[in-house]
Each structure stands twice: as structure tokens, then as C-alpha cells.
Amino acid sequence: LPFIAFCAAAGFAQIIGTNLLLMAFGYRNYVAGTAFAKTEAMQGALLAFLLLGETLSWLTISGIAVGVAGVMIVAAGGQRLRLPDIVQPAALCGLGAGLGFTMTSIFVKSASLELATSDKLLAALVALVVVQGWQTLMQGSYVAVREREQLPRVFSTWRTSGQVGLLAALGSACWFTGFATAPVALVRAVGQVEVILTLGFSRFYLREARKPGEA
């Protein structure tokens, strides 16, 4: 029962975090929301210590802080962030999104620890299947009840959405495996490399111009 509860909580927290991040895009100063969402690694270090008892060396914490600061600067796209920005709706949504993703990490790790197996990879993959199954049920039910007209569109684009879903599932499998085998904050911090990969993909594959703040 605790395993199912942790998986359900992880799925719900991830949905809330994603919705808050999308809400941040709807505000004028959405850049602040995106930047503050990148504080998830620092939030993870604090909450994992309080809830899971995970401890990190001061050197590791300092490295995470520097990494988070760098990612926030890149995410801000050259825009200067000030302390008052933290109370803006976009920033609050960003912080809430970071908290949602952090709690997802903690719930996933807790779920993996509940399984009676020493195979952490197996535990992570079982948790992944349950979490994504629960998310599919929740969101599918919502669409079926509230936005039924969207269902034909979903099925008509199954080829494209299937490819995206497969890549997302593979990414989630890596995330879940990381959470099951290493401290939450470290996994989140290393995962920030996605920003560098995104910039590289944007520059060399999509041929998009680089912004001054990304230099």
C-alpha cells in the first residue's frame, strides 16, 4: 500500500509541477518563472535532507549551488533577476513547479525503497510503470470528461505523439533509476545538463540564433 501511495503522489506532483511551469509561461515576466523553476536541485537537497535524511558534503552543496546559479542565468536569457522578482506570479509559479518536480523525485525514491528487492533498476522501472499508468488514468479521465472533443485529435496524431511519448518514457526511466540509486539533489543537479544539450540541439540542429545571455 505505501508503494502505491508514493507512486500516486509522485504522478500527481509531476502533473502539478508541469501545470505550474506552463502557467508561468502565461505571464509577462515568464522568464523569471523559467529561471526559478531551475532551483529544483537546491530544493531537492533541502527536502531530501528533511524527509529522507540524505546528507551531502559542503563541497557537493556548493557545487550544486553554483550549477543552479549558472542554469538560472542561462534560463533568464540575459535578463537580470532581482530579489523582488521572486514575489511575481511567474516566479511563484516557477518555484512551485520546482517544488512539484522535487517532491516527484522524493516520492519516486520512497516508492523504490518500499519494494522488497535489492535490484534498484527493477524497483525504478516498476515504479515508472505504476506512476505513468496512474498519470494516464488521471489525465485520460479528465480529457474524457471535460474535453471529450480532444480525444479524436489525440488518436489522429498517434504516430508523432507515440514517438514523443517513447522518448519521454526513456528519459523518465533514466530519471527514476537515478532517484533509486543516488541522492535526489545530485541526480537533479546532474540532470541540469539538459540545458546544455538543449542549447546545442537548438544551435546545431534547428539552426536557431544564440541569445546574448546564452554566450
Residue spans for each PLM region:
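Membrane-interface helix-loop-helix junctions at boundaries between adjacent transmembrane segments
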Residues: L21-S62
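Residue-level recognition of transmembrane alpha-helices
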Residues: C7, A37, T60-I64, L128-Q132, ...
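Residues that define the loop-to-transmembrane-helix transition and helix capping
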Residues: V31, S57, L122-L125, A185
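Hydrophobic transmembrane alpha-helices of multi-pass small-molecule transport proteins
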Residues: L46-L52, L59-G78, F201, G213-A215
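Short hydrophobic/small-residue motifs within alpha-helical transmembrane segments
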Residues: G11-F12, K38-T39, L99, L166, ...
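Alpha-helical transmembrane segments of compact multi-pass small-molecule transporters, enriched
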Residues: F36-L50, W134, M138, G171-C174, ...
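Membrane-interface interhelical linkers
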Residues: L1-F12, T18-Y27, A69, A76-L95, ...
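Hydrophobic alpha-helical transmembrane segments in multi-pass integral membrane proteins
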Residues: G44-L59, L99-E114, L166-V184
